């Protein structure tokens, strides 16, 4: 049984929604067990609430050490100035012991993201790949396998690097049906590859 972790950070719920769609897609693949977890919040609780952060996220909080228990990990993060959110950065910065032991070497990884206005969504994914490459992950983009990526009739997220959503400057825009379809495709695509490599 190939074990996949969908690991995310979400402040306002956009990445949480994409994470659910990613997991839904991954669960379509036979022989795969999917778990959704989130990284710890680093903001003080009162500051998080004052900023309008979503406090009712059901996914349990992960620890860095448990990453070694999975065959594949799909990371989700909002964009912060063109890079991953600080909460995800802080979590990954605690994986030095896993790097030293080679515990993540050869595992499958993929990345999805959210941006306010689209600025930095691709760079957020590809800059996250740098950290994953240092661990020796096999990085899986989605290419143009999702037909929704060819639709230019509306504003939407989605890249050949991974699923994305555009939240709007005030965070009011929720992931569209097309963005969720791309996320489901990513989950299924990564799960198929992980299942093959885990045999």
Curated annotation (Swiss-Prot):
Keywords: Flavoprotein, FMN, NAD, NADP, Nucleotide-binding, Oxidoreductase. One of its GO terms (cellular component) is membrane. SUPFAM superfamilies: Flavoproteins. It catalyses: a quinone + NADH + H(+) = a quinol + NAD(+); a quinone + NADPH + H(+) = a quinol + NADP(+). NAD(+) binds at residue 12. Belongs to the WrbA family. This is NAD(P)H dehydrogenase (quinone).
């Amino acid at each position: 049984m190939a074990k996949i972790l969908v690991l995310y950070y979400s402040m306002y719920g956009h990445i949480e929604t994409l994470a659910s769609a990613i997991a839904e897609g991954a669960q379509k693949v036979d022989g795969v067990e999917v778990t959704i977890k989130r990284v710890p919040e680093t903001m003080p609780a009162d500051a998080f609430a004052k900023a309008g952060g979503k406090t009712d996220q059901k996914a349990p909080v992960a620890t860095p050490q448990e990453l070694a228990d999975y065959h594949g990990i799909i990371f989700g993060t909002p964009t912060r100035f063109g890079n991953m959110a600080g909460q995800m950065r802080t979590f990954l910065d605690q994986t030095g012991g896993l790097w030293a032991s080679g515990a993540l070497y050869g595992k499958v990884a993929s990345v999805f993201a959210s941006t306010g206005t689209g600025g930095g969504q691709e760079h957020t994914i590809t800059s996250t790949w740098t950290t994953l490459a240092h661990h020796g992950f096999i990085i899986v983009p989605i290419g143009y396998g999702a037909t929704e990526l060819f639709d230019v009739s509306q504003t939407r997220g989605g890249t050949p690097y991974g699923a994305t959503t555009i939240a709007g400057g005030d965070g009011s825009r929720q992931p569209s049906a097309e963005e969720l379809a791309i996320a489901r495709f990513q989950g299924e695509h990564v799960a198929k590859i992980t299942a093959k490599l885990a045999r």
